Regions:
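Catalytic cores of alpha/beta
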Residues: 37-48, 57-68
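Residue-level recognition of short, structured coil/turn motifs
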Residues: 25-26, 49, 124-128
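C-terminal alpha-helical cap/extension of soluble enzyme domains
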Residues: 58-154
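Glycine-rich tight-turn/loop motif centered on a GG-T
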Residues: 1-16, 47-52, 90-109
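Alpha-helix-loop-beta-strand connector modules within alpha/beta enzyme cores
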Residues: 9-31, 35, 39-47
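Short, electropositive alpha-helical surface patch
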Residues: 13-19, 42-56, 89, 131-137
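Flexible loop/turn segments at secondary-structure boundaries
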Residues: 1, 37-41, 82-84
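Hydrophobic faces of well-ordered beta-strands that scaffold small-molecule active sites
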Residues: 29-32, 52-54, 72-76
Length: 154
């Protein structure tokens, strides 16, 4: 979805997600367009010269429900872009003579990091990276060729 595509809170068909997960429990689902479009980030953008119309995304609670039911990849790019944009607008408004990108990119990255840390914690993926083992491309190709990665329908 993007930041300008819905005019009210998006409620997902979690019954469908749950049904898919029940039939294909080993299949990892992806939530495209799952940014929450936080109101506080919209407010920062608009307070510092933006003209972002009132819009809504997917409530984080809905995403959390999806994760409990087989969703393994969630796209939150819009939230990150909003955090970056708001931080840059704030610096450039408050320090109008500023021209050094380091002065506005550092707070922009910090704002994005804040969004990411929040989502990593809420989505229960914080601290999980050490559990991921790198798999060589040749091994993955062999898995695909053997059919061992084909979905199992229950």
């Amino acid at each position: 979805m993007g930041a300008n595509e819905t005019k009210n809170t998006t409620i997902l068909a979690m019954d469908v997600v749950k049904a898919i997960h029940a039939k294909l429990p080993d299949t990892h689902l992806v939530m495209h367009g799952s940014s929450s479009v936080p109101q506080d980030l919209q407010d920062i953008i608009n307070e510092f010269g933006g003209e972002m119309p009132q819009t809504y995304g997917v409530p984080v609670e809905e995403i959390e429900t999806g994760i409990k039911n087989g969703v393994r990849k969630v796209n939150i790019d819009t939230d990150n872009r909003m955090a970056i944009t708001g931080a840059i607008r704030k610096v450039l408004t408050e320090k109008r003579a500023e021209f050094d990108p380091r002065a506005y990119l550092k707070p922009a990255l910090e704002a994005m990091e804040e969004v990411c840390v929040d989502r990593f914690q809420r989505f229960n993926c914080a601290g999980q990276a050490p559990k991921i083992k790198a798999i060589p491309l040749s091994d993955m190709a062999a898995r695909y060729a053997s059919g061992s990665l084909d979905p199992t329908v229950h």
